[in-house]
């Protein structure tokens, strides 16, 4: 059977999908994809997989794809990051029997992508990208697709898209932000760029960016002429977005937990999803946020979900008619709704330099100066000191800089003291080292 291409691929293999769930690291796992499909998603992507690791590590393949699919999870596109044509194709060949297409990630703007030379940081290397797409197009039995970010210039973005199409890309997802637009500096995605790409290419185009509700989906399709719309953050905060519904936050959480019992995933994924779903409620009920951060089993998570449901129902019962939601929210905290990322503060480093670091999730805490992992540990161990300025100071070894022994006669650490004692045939009672002859 000949490989489907372009619009035939979109209409037949993908069923003319218009509502698409984005590839999200540690977030678009099988259980979440199944939940999204129950509520209107017509196509899903796997989380981004590293092609090089996928090729060399059988356990990575098993855990991240082979055991993370099921018959109901179709159509499905597997996404890879790569910067070597042969490695990309080898990984794709190992994955193609489990999906309907292979996607090359050309949109990740994070610093880890810059260090690894993949994602949006390949967008200037057109010769390399042509070779990667062409080789995949020639050797795979399924189509190859791409997810890109735009350039500031519309005409360069159009030429970029046309280059990928000419190389063999059969479907293009365009995120209407540049690689510099991320975190607090994300701003608004440019549908004008997406519209220009759609007019200039002869393959299906999906739009990504500024999608918070079903009305945004419909408006985006109408304004840009794209074949479908991809949602990431909007989907995480309301998996029923494509249905045009805004259910109670515990309703979708309980449904998701039921799916996880059938299709297990790491508890960290579950916790991250619930932090998103319950974002606004956890601002009201801080204790539940701390409990969610500490639980170590799925049943513990379910107990927190039940407690949250009871708290929300009590809030609903106390709600007076005609009172508006607090903090200018579009709905009360117990209703699934979009999260509006705050912009940079006036005079902040991000605002003045144009550079931004990935923002910590607000639900993880607001202790400045701590890493994301430290924040998680702080929530689990509230009495432990994580501030480096409050930790005890140790005098340093005169030679290597490690902490010295408090009773060492040479002011050295154990290792340096032992070497000196052997060299000089000397004693150090502090390190219980006696070498001087009696």
From Swiss-Prot:
It is found in: Cytoplasm; Nucleus. SUPFAM superfamilies: FMN-linked oxidoreductases (SSF51395). It comes from the Eukaryota. It catalyses: 5,6-dihydrouridine(16) in tRNA + NADP(+) = uridine(16) in tRNA + NADPH + H(+); 5,6-dihydrouridine(16) in tRNA + NAD(+) = uridine(16) in tRNA + NADH + H(+); 5,6-dihydrouridine(17) in tRNA + NAD(+) = uridine(17) in tRNA + NADH + H(+); 5,6-dihydrouridine(17) in tRNA + NADP(+) = uridine(17) in tRNA + NADPH + H(+). FMN binds at residues 23-25, 79, 147, 175, 208-210, 232-233. Keywords: Cytoplasm, Flavoprotein, FMN, NAD, NADP, Nucleus, Oxidoreductase, tRNA processing. Residues 373-383 have a biased composition (Basic residues). Disulfide bonds: none annotated. Residues 343-387 are annotated as: Disordered. Pfam families: Dus (PF01207). The active site is at 108 (proton donor). Its EC number is 1.3.1.88. PROSITE patterns: UPF0034. The keyword Flavoprotein applies. One of its GO terms (biological process) is tRNA dihydrouridine synthesis. GO terms for cellular component: cytoplasm; nucleus. One of its GO terms (molecular function) is tRNA-dihydrouridine17 synthase activity. Its cofactor is FMN. Belongs to the Dus family. Dus1 subfamily. Catalyzes the synthesis of dihydrouridine, a modified base found in the D-loop of most tRNAs. Specifically modifies U16 and U17 in cytoplasmic tRNAs. Affects the level of some mature tRNA and thereby the total cellular translation. This is tRNA-dihydrouridine(16/17) synthase [NAD(P)(+)]-like. It comes from Rattus norvegicus (Rat). The lineage of its organism: Eukaryota, Metazoa, Chordata, Craniata, Vertebrata. The gene is Dus1l.
């Amino acid at each position: 059977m000949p490989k489907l291409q372009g619009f035939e691929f979109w209409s037949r293999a993908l069923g003319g999908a218009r509502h698409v769930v984005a590839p999200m690291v540690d977030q678009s796992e099988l259980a979440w994809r199944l939940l999204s499909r129950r509520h209107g998603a017509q196509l899903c992507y796997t989380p981004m997989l590293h092609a090089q690791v996928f090729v060399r590590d059988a356990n990575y393949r098993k855990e991240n794809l082979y055991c993370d699919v099921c018959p109901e999870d179709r159509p499905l596109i597997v996404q890879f990051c790569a910067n070597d044509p042969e490695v990309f194709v080898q990984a794709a060949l190992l994955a193609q029997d489990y999906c309907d297409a292979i996607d090359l990630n050309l949109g990740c703007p994070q610093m880890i992508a810059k260090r690894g030379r993949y994602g949006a940081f390949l967008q200037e290397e057109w010769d390399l990208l042509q070779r990667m797409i062409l080789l995949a197009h020639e050797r795979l039995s399924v189509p190859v697709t791409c997810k890109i970010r735009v350039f500031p210039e519309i005409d360069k973005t159009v030429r970029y898209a046309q280059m990928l199409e000419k190389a063999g890309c059969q479907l293009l997802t365009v995120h209407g932000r540049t690689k510099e637009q991320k975190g607090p500096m994300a701003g608004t995605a440019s549908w004008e760029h997406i519209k220009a790409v759609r007019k200039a290419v002869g393959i299906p185009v999906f739009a990504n960016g500024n999608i918070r509700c079903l009305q945004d989906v419909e408006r985006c399709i109408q304004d840009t002429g794209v074949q479908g719309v991809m949602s990431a953050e909007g989907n995480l905060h309301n998996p029923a977005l494509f249905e045009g519904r805004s259910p109670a936050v515990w309703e979708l959480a309980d449904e998701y937990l039921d799916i996880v019992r059938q299709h297990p995933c790491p508890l960290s994924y579950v916790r991250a999803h619930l932090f998103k779903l319950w974002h606004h409620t956890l601002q009201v009920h801080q204790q539940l946020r701390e409990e969610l951060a500490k639980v170590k089993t799925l049943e513990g998570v379910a107990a927190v979900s039940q407690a949250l449901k009871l708290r929300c129902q009590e809030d609903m019962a106390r709600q007076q008619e005609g009172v508006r939601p607090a903090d200018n929210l579009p709905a009360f905290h117990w209703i699934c709704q979009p999260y509006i990322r705050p912009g940079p503060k006036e005079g902040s480093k991000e605002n003045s330099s144009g550079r931004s670091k990935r923002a910590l999730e607000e639900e993880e805490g607001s202790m400045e100066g701590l890493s994301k992992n430290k924040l998680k540990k702080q929530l689990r161990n509230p009495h432990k000191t994580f501030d480096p300025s409050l930790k005890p100071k140790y005098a340093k070894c005169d030679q290597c800089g490690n902490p010295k022994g408090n009773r060492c006669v040479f002011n050295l650490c154990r290792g340096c003291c032992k070497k000196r004692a052997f060299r000089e045939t000397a004693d150090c009672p502090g390190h219980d080292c006696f070498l001087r002859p009696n």
